[in-house]
């Protein structure tokens, strides 16, 4: 794990030294001495616009011309236009710096802050850069046994020179705690499905949350049957691995404080069931529990900070497998709410899991607000690509807050429509509703949202986040490698702070 330190006095023991230059290409007053020490290397570089323009995110790694001393590289990072800098951009810049240092095999980095930023305190700037670097340091290579030494290389430490190291370290500790919650979400999402069975996943939740003072209850199939959870149980009945409902309760607020319920889809592996998916890219269905992982990660972050809020998390953990005992297209299931659903497509299973999970959360905990998170539809990826998650809500204020926070932490949401005509499309001839719409390939994400909406009680504020396009990525970003992104943890953690 990357070691991050904040110190008041500069050290010359780091192999790489980072400096920041904006698009005006002017040296900070605190860089003049350093530039002279390195025989004008920084000033010469920024005077040559073919080498460096100062645009945001540009990183230039230059071998030092000094033969003595520990500093082997100067790393010049472009800030762009200071007025356009956001906290999210500063964080991503920290990730880019770490990635370039890793590529150049620089094991220790010193970071010299800039004097040219007036909109952020030096403590805030330093903690954000450190947070981005820490997030970018994540790896999932536990099953790779033949890695070459060069592939194993990782930056060991970052040392940030700041005039208030104690205060900056306090800010970073909170960000580090949140990042570690993101790492749990990434880890469990990246885990192969033959390892993370519903039972194993549930055990990992217990092991991670109980030491933080979170009450965790793991409900098995017998109890779910007694509760009438026919929708969730129907999805998992084709698997030899027993389905689980994991209930997490964090009581950090007063008894009369409102409860926020987070509900996550945890389909450990989704073959599509009898409505079998194509084999191409089916292996990516190990990420179909990304919503549940985001819920667990959020509760880790909230409980770790001991926030004064009441949060409950409910995640349904199932495997959607074909077998002689699997659910069939045309089956009718009775949900915990008493409503019935005709299963016309067994690959539209996530909404069935959520139907019972959101109802359970409302019945037991009487929350003021319910937010469900799910890799629910391929249709949302067609609509929004891999940039935005879809946000459906019955409350404009709730949706606006979520979208605002999403912009702040760079986990973007786009408001999607709800309409009575969409709701009418899931009416069934033989049951209360069907799990797909009656117009093929039409409004798939909206149809799925309306299915869940039928299980939200009157007076409950509700948002549904369809994260199918953003939960995992086939390419690296500034804040992490390809694979599980950990989307939703930072969004929901920040929302909870602001909402309460």
Curated annotation (Swiss-Prot):
Q: What is its main location?
A: cytoplasm
Tell me which residues bind Mn(2+) 2: 265, 270, 288, 349
At the top level, the lineage of the source is Bacteria
Q: Where is the active site?
A: 277, 351
GO cellular component terms, alphabetically, are: cytoplasm
Comment on bound cofactor: Binds 2 manganese ions per subunit.
Q: Which GO terms describe its biological process?
A: proteolysis
Give me the residues that bind Mn(2+) 1, please.
270, 347, 349
Q: What are the protein's UniProt keywords?
A: Aminopeptidase, Cytoplasm, Hydrolase, Manganese, Metal-binding, Protease
Gene Ontology terms, MF aspect: manganese ion binding; metalloaminopeptidase activity
EC identifiers of the protein? 3.4.11.1, 3.4.11.10
Q: Which Pfam family, just one, is annotated for this protein?
A: Peptidase_M17_N
The cofactor required is: Mn(2+)
Q: Where in the cell is it found?
A: Cytoplasm
- Top EC category: hydrolase
Name the catalysed reactions.
Release of an N-terminal amino acid, Xaa-|-Yaa-, in which Xaa is preferably Leu, but may be other amino acids including Pro although not Arg or Lys, and Yaa may be Pro. Amino acid amides and methyl esters are also readily hydrolyzed, but rates on arylamides are exceedingly low; Release of an N-terminal amino acid, preferentially leucine, but not glutamic or aspartic acids
Q: Which NCBIfam families does the UniProt entry name for this protein?
A: PRK00913.1-2, PRK00913.1-4, PRK00913.2-2, PRK00913.2-4
Entry's PANTHER family? CYTOSOL AMINOPEPTIDASE (PTHR11963:SF23), LEUCINE AMINOPEPTIDASE-RELATED (PTHR11963)
HAMAP family named among the record's database cross-references? Cytosol_peptidase_M17 (MF_00181)
Q: Which family does it belong to?
A: Belongs to the peptidase M17 family.
Q: What does this protein do?
A: Presumably involved in the processing and regular turnover of intracellular proteins. Catalyzes the removal of unsubstituted N-terminal amino acids from various peptides.
The protein's name is Probable cytosol aminopeptidase
Organism equals Rickettsia peacockii (strain Rustic)
Q: What lineage is this protein's organism placed in?
A: Bacteria, Pseudomonadati, Pseudomonadota, Alphaproteobacteria, Rickettsiales
Question: What is the gene name?
Answer: pepA
